[in-house]
């Protein structure tokens, strides 16, 4: 049984871009070697306004971050919304240090990776 939840896609700019407080997400991307890396962000807004077959997002991050470089190379990422418990935030912060290499931070990561099949 998967812990993923199916959420209704909302075709409304304001409902998908206005959050208070702004939620924190863990963005997962693929590294050059095919491994998954995670990075926490709060300045991200997913949009479903470009049409039924297209999704968009606004992400504010350093262009040199692992996340940015992986998205630029692969054109793909997953947004994983997390709860607002202090324990969860502590784990998210551990993934956020600039200059950390995925090979250094991922072995210590407490977030559980879950395989999912999807078509893109």
Please describe what each predicted stretch is.
Residues 1-37, 45-120:
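Active-site-proximal mixed secondary-structure blocks
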């Amino acid at each position: 049984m998967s812990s993923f939840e199916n959420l209704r896609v909302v075709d409304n700019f304001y409902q998908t871009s206005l959050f208070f407080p702004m939620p924190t997400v863990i963005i997962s991307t693929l590294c050059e070697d095919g491994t998954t890396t995670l990075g926490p962000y709060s300045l991200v807004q997913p949009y479903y306004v470009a049409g039924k077959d297209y999704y968009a997002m606004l992400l504010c991050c350093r262009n040199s971050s692992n996340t940015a470089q992986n998205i630029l190379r692969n054109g793909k990422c997953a947004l994983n919304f997390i709860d607002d418990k202090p324990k969860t935030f502590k784990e998210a912060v551990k993934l956020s240090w600039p200059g950390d290499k995925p090979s250094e931070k991922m072995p210590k990561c407490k977030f559980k990776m879950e395989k999912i099949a999807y078509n893109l």
